[in-house]
């Protein structure tokens, strides 16, 4: 068998079975939810998170007319370091968000499972409490309340 291996028409690599199964599941979920409902859930989730971030006292980096629904960029509070805030979020709350190249901002991805209500509450709470741990004066409760009030636009989109 070894002598004829290279001459045969066999595919001699392992197929990416986990990737194929993951793609199948992702497409199944999209078909089940439908694209219009998925897009609307992402839009509502992003607007709600943006409102919560601003209500707690943080400033968003991008002007409202230019914002995307897929990522939220947050200005790092004065006299703090985004890497330190992100480290606290990771270590204390098991929440990962991104920094940026060249700018001291924090970015929260707003796609897929992040646009589920329980994940929105978790990331906003982790962000607020991590900033407070670094001495930033924020009203985390007000931010959480604003997030919640923006999510009730249509609860159907946010079923977990």
Regions found by a protein language model. Name each.
Residues 83-92, 122-127:
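Short amphipathic alpha-helices in soluble, non-transmembrane regions
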Residues 34-41, 57-64, 98-102, 134-145:
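Flexible, glycine/charged-enriched surface loops at secondary-structure junctions
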Residues 70-74, 104-109:
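A generic structural motif
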Residues 59-89:
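Conserved PLP-binding catalytic core of the aspartate aminotransferase-like
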Residues 92-107:
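Conserved PLP cofactor-binding pocket of PLP-dependent enzymes
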Residues 106-160:
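PLP-dependent enzyme catalytic core of the Aspartate aminotransferase-like
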Residues 25-36, 47, 51-58, 77, ...:
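Generic secondary-structure signature for well-ordered alpha-helical cores
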Residues 1-55, 159-160:
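Active-site C-terminal subdomain of aminotransferase-like
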